[in-house]
Structure formats: C-alpha cells, structure tokens
C-alpha cells in the first residue's frame, strides 16, 4: 500500500459486521475463560490483552498504523512525547552508562538528558551535529550505549545528517534513536537511512489537532542487541522467569522489553480515548502535511525578504545551510514550523507576539492552527545563556508553526504584527 492508503487502512481491518471505524475500548481490564489463559499472558507465552496499562485494542490500532508508516517492526505508544523519549532511552541505559546527543534538541529533552538523567547516574555528551564524522567519534566512550538526535530540530530547524549519525552510532556499537516528530514519516522515514529507533510526540503532527496528548516509540528491528553491550535484552530477565528478550522476540526484542518492563513498572500508558483521537488524526496526515509545507514555504519566503527580520531558519529556503540535507532526506517537503530572528531582540519579539490576532500565542506546535512562541522565555526557559547559545536560540528567536489556514490570512496577520512592533 502507498503511504496515503496506509494512513487510512493500516492498523485496523474490520471483519464482517464489525465497526467500520476502530472503536474506543474504554476498559481497564479484560475477561478470560480460565485462570490458565491469564497465566500464559503474564508469562508472555501468549498474545492478548489483560490490562490497559500494557495493551489496549484502540491503542494497538494506533501502534500498528505508526509501525506501518515508519517501516518498523513494532511500536509502543505512551502517554506523552516526553515519556516516549524517556522510555526509549531508559530501555537501554542504566547507572554508569553514557550516550551522545545532538545539541539541537527540544528544551524538555535537553533538561531530561542534562539534569534528570544525571541524577540517575547516566551521562550525556552534547555534540555539534555539523562536525565531521571523525570529530564526532571523539565523543565515543567504552560505555557509550546510545546516540540521539532529531530529524528536524525543535526549534532551531536544523536538518540531521541521518547517515552520518548512523555511522557514528555504528562506530560506538550503539543504536541511533531519532525523534521524527517534526518531519513525520510522510516526509522522512529515518529507519531507511540507518536509524534503529524512531520516536514521536504524537501530540503534534500525527494527531494534528492539539486534542490528544501522546508519544510513540517504533523499533526498527535492525540492531544487534546481542553484541555484548546490552545484557538487559540478551540475558535472562528474572521477573519473567529467566526469559531472554532477544531469543524469544527476535527483531522486536527492544520494544517488547519497553512494554513489559518499563510500561509495567512506570505506567505512562495512553488513555484509549486519546488513542482513538490519534487514530482519527493520522487518517489525514498526508493531506495535512502537504498543506503545512506549502504554507510554511510561502511564509519563510515572505520572512526572508522582510526588513524587520534578521534571519530565517527554514531548510526549504535555498539560502539555508541545510538545504542540501533537506534535498537528500526530505526531498518532497518539510514541516510547517519556522523559526526566525526578529530585529530588536526580546523586547521587539514580545511586541510582535502580543500584536498577533489570528495567530495564537501558545506552548504547542505542529497542529492545524497557526501559532507562535518565544522559546528563550518558554520551552527553553530553564537553559542557561551558554546552553541557549549551544542550542541555537537567540533572544530574538520566534518559533512559528504554520497551520492549514488560507495563506493570505496567515501573511496578513504576520504583516500587521510587524507593523505594530516597529
């Protein structure tokens, strides 16, 4: 099936007399005819549902759809994008481990890596993703267990050289985990370029309507967990009577462990209602992303010529330093998110934001309505001046998420805000 068809049909195939649309299974638990059947479920000897924290039919439909769209082997949905990043990393990291991350990451991800993981005894090295591969390799240590980056960085809008980072991960004998939230699988499928795990904040473009909080982790099924560095997957798990994930579940070992161990113990499971809304949102993903891209490209070109704008970050512009990477990894389009530096810094940025009329001021991003934000005083507020600089966030940087409204209405609102900010 082609991508657009998968958006509609993957994950749920109703049989004779069943609902045409995946129903909401609003139940915490499930009944069985015998105690033996339940016992097999708990020992992972049989597939099925026994508690919604671990699995739910509505959520499973969303997971299977995401797996099909990303080209992986299995997916686990979570209650939020932040919990997806946390679980994806914690599934293979423990006290004493080290990992490498691009410095161009979302503020919440930066805080998780730099501060929360530090309290857990896990150390990160942030690297400049523009450095040559041989320079990046200098960050590798014997205990390096993962490499992390974002396909399109939030909010710097830098495009990742996925193949270069895949080579870095291979040199470290570690998996490459990529947050594909901004690109979506419609424009880029990182697994095809060497990524091993793909993460989403499904609250963004996959849902598309800012109505359902959620996250997802997709296992590419293409990493060798038996290389001696990941005993969590390749040696017996005593909580399941000595089960070895790599032996029992093969290519899906990573995601099964995340579900039956991390979700079991930490419990950031999505609500069935949110999974239903995510399923509905993904049905129109291809149509929405095309409109987001068209609007953002037009807005970026408008901003690039505007006298009150110092700089525009959008890889779709031929003047962008990442234009060649965009052509390689995202040849058919980009997200609807732009960031730009307004002349006058923080004070002028506030005036511009306050003057917006149709465009809303909000923390969210990547949904059907146009919205704007000042990262330095919101999503990245906890970062120091040095950390902000490392992440590419200046005092005058504004993040603009272009919705699917008529482009003339978007441009008119932006222009009147510029006039008010003079």
Model-derived regions: residue spans:
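Glycine-rich beta-alpha junction loops
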Residues: 11-12, 26-32, 221-222, 282-284, ...
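N-terminal glycine-rich, Lys/His-bearing helix-loop that initiates the first secondary-structure elements
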Residues: 1-46
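Conserved small-domain helix->loop->beta segment predominantly found in fold-type I
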Residues: 266-269, 273-275, 280, 284, ...
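Glycine-centered tight turns that cap/initiate beta-strands
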Residues: 71, 143, 308-311, 396
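Conserved N-terminal alpha-helix of the aminotransferase class I/II PLP-enzyme fold
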Residues: 34-86, 108-116
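PLP-dependent enzyme catalytic core of the Aspartate aminotransferase-like
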Residues: 114-115, 123-125, 138, 142-145, ...
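Conserved PLP-enzyme active-site core in the AAT-like
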Residues: 7-13, 75-305
């Amino acid at each position: 099936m082609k991508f657009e068809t998968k958006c509609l049909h993957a994950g749920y195939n109703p049989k004779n007399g069943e609902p045409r649309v995946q129903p909401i299974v609003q139940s915490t638990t499930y009944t069985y005819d015998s105690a033996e059947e339940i016992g097999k479920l708990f020992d992972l000897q049989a597939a099925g549902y026994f508690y919604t924290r671990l699995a739910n039919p509505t959520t499973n439909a969303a997971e299977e759809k995401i797996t099909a769209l990303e080209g992986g082997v299995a997916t686990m949905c979570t209650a939020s994008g932040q919990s997806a990043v946390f679980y994806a990393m914690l599934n293979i990291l423990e006290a004493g481990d080290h990992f490498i991350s691009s410095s161009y990451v979302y503020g919440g991800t930066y805080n998780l890596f730099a501060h929360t993981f530090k309290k857990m005894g896990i150390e990160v090295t942030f690297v400049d993703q523009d450095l040559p591969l041989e320079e990046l390799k200098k960050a590798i240590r014997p205990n390096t267990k993962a490499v992390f980056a974002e396909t399109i960085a939030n909010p710097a809008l830098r495009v990742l050289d996925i193949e270069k980072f895949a080579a870095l991960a291979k040199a470290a004998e570690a998996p490459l985990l990529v947050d594909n939230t901004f690109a979506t699988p419609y424009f880029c499928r990182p697994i095809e370029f060497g990524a091993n795990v793909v993460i989403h904040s499904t609250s963004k473009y996959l849902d598309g309507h800012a109505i359902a909080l959620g996250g997802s982790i997709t296992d590419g099924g293409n990493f060798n967990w038996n290389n001696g560095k990941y005993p969590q997957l390749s040696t017996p798990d005593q909580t399941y009577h000595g089960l070895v994930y790599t032996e029992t579940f093969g290519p899906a070992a990573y995601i099964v462990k995340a579900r039956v161990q991390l979700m079991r113990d930490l419990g950031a499971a999505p609500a069935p209602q949110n999974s239903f809304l995510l399923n509905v949102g993904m049905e129109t993903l291809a149509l929405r992303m095309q409109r987001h891209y068209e609007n953002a490209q037009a807005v970026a070109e408008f901003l690039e010529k505007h006298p009150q704008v110092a700089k525009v970050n959008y890889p779709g512009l031929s003047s962008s330093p990442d234009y060649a990477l965009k052509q390689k990894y995202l040849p058919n389009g980009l997200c609807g998110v732009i960031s730009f530096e307004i002349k006058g810094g923080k004070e002028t940025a506030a005036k511009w934001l306050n003057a917006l009329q149709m465009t809303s001021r909000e923390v969210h991003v990547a949904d059907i309505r146009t919205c704007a934000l000042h990262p330095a005083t919101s999503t990245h507020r906890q970062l120091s001046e040095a950390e902000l600089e490392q992440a590419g966030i200046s005092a005058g940087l504004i993040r603009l998420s272009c919705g699917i409204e008529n482009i003339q209405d978007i441009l008119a609102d932006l222009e009147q805000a510029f006039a008010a900010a003079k």
